Curated annotation (Swiss-Prot):
GO terms for molecular function: NADH dehydrogenase activity; oxidoreductase activity, acting on NAD(P)H, quinone or similar compound as acceptor; quinone binding. It is an enzyme of class 7 (translocase). Pfam families: NADHdh. InterPro entries: NADH_UbQ_OxRdtase_su1/FPO, NADH_UbQ_OxRdtase_su1_CS. It catalyses: a quinone + NADH + 5 H(+)(in) = a quinol + NAD(+) + 4 H(+)(out). The lineage of its organism: Bacteria, Pseudomonadati, Pseudomonadota, Betaproteobacteria, Neisseriales. Keywords: Cell inner membrane, Cell membrane, Membrane, NAD, Quinone, Translocase, Transmembrane, Transmembrane helix, Ubiquinone. Belongs to the complex I subunit 1 family. NDH-1 is composed of 14 different subunits. Subunits NuoA, H, J, K, L, M, N constitute the membrane sector of the complex. This is NADH-quinone oxidoreductase subunit H. The keyword NAD applies. GO terms for biological process: aerobic respiration. The chain crosses the membrane at residues 22-42, 97-117, 130-150, 170-190, 208-228, 255-275, 292-312, 336-356.
């Protein structure tokens, strides 16, 4: 709000544009906020790939990137330049228009979702009351990019990978949505700020034990597993199983077009980390009592720490577990996670109307 008012005063009063200046100031402030979100987000993607290689290398008793720049810190930029300057090729019999629309359709929702993600009570582009519903809606659109890319490539490997990815995403989206419905039930809102505020209340209010991860622990586990499968990350990355279908719907893409898919995948990972922090880990709330001074004060710092912890968990999962078979993934989703999710909604409803309600 402070930035918006400053730009509106600048264009309306200082530059003498009147009512037009108020509108221009609003538009400019929104553009500036978008840039402030997107540039750090893209840099985070770059260095997330670096830390992924370092962490997995450490777990496998390797060094990881250590040549390009001090400690390999320039390696992400070398990878970016390599992809940007590679030739973008496509199969002769592919559908040219849809071939290039696919990566854009995958990337656009990953950027658009950040419009409603708050980093603290003030740092948010758009604070709407249906923020969670918006996230579920906008992220579900990315599957269209995968399907379009697989079909337009005119390759059996691409098409099979796209079918696997879309079926897996749709299946685990049900389980993840059921888990998030439980959070909405105990919070009484789909506004992210209200959900975080609700985690500071209840019987254990003001402590780490009041965050949703503990009272909703079974559904928290369902959510974490579903989130990994939803983003097609290991051990649920059968959509690009190298030993079976080469690289799935990525197989015919190179250069900048492949970079868009790569960027979308890692932005969705960071988005899931932010969503996990907001819904289950208290968002910007501190794990320490407020009487401890600065470290007990809610701030964006704690939001970023929790996001980093979830991202590390993603990397640990990839380095630890072998890839599941496709039939095992579908069985886990439909026969285990989805039934648990819907059963817990009923259990939670009974719990909340009982005398043992923890969220009063």
């Amino acid at each position: 709000m402070i930035m918006q008012e400053w730009f509106q005063n600048l264009f309306a009063a200082t530059l003498g544009l009147g009512d037009l200046g108020i509108t221009v100031g609003l538009v400019v402030s929104v553009i500036v906020k978008i840039v402030i979100i997107l540039i750090p987000l893209i840099l985070t993607v770059a260095y997330l790939t670096y830390f992924e290689r370092k962490v997995i290398g450490f777990m496998q008793l390797r060094v990881g990137p250590n040549v390009t720049g001090p400690w390999g810190l320039i390696q992400p930029f070398a990878d970016v330049f390599k992809l940007l300057f590679k030739e973008v090729t496509r199969p002769k019999l592919s559908n040219k228009a849809l071939f290039y629309i696919g990566p854009i359709m995958s990337l656009a929702p990953s950027f658009a979702a950040w419009a409603v993600i708050p980093f603290n009570e003030e740092w948010v582009l758009t604070n709407i009351n249906i923020g969670l519903l918006y996230i579920l809606m906008i992220t579900s659109l990315s599957v269209y990019g995968v399907i379009i890319a697989g079909w337009a490539s005119n390759s059996k490997y691409s098409f099979l990978g796209a079918m696997r990815a879309s079926a897996q995403s749709i299946s685990y989206e049900i389980a993840m949505s059921a888990a998030l419905v439980c959070v909405v039930m105990v919070s009484g809102s789909m506004n992210f700020s209200d959900i975080v505020a609700a985690q500071a209340k209840g019987i254990a209010g003001g402590s780490v034990f009041s965050w949703n991860w503990l009272p909703l622990f079974p559904i928290f586990i369902v959510y974490l597993i579903s989130a990994v499968a939803e983003t097609n990350r290991a051990p649920f990355d059968v959509a690009e199983g190298e030993s079976e279908i080469v690289a799935g719907h990525h197989v015919e893409y190179s250069g900048f077009a492949f970079a868009l898919f790569f960027l979308a995948e890692y932005i969705f990972m960071i988005l899931i980390a932010a969503l996990t922090s907001l819904m289950f880990l208290g968002g910007w709330l501190s794990p320490f009592p407020q009487s401890w001074g600065f470290i007990g004060t809610p701030s964006a710092f704690w939001m970023f720490v929790k996001m980093a912890a979830v991202l590390y968990w993603y990397l640990w999962i990839r380095a630890t577990f072998p890839r599941y078979r496709y039939d095992q993934i579908m069985r886990l989703g439909w026969k285990v996670l989805i039934p648990i999710g819907f059963a817990y909604i009923v259990i939670l409803g009974v719990w909340m109307i009982s005398p043992l309600n923890l969220w009063k």
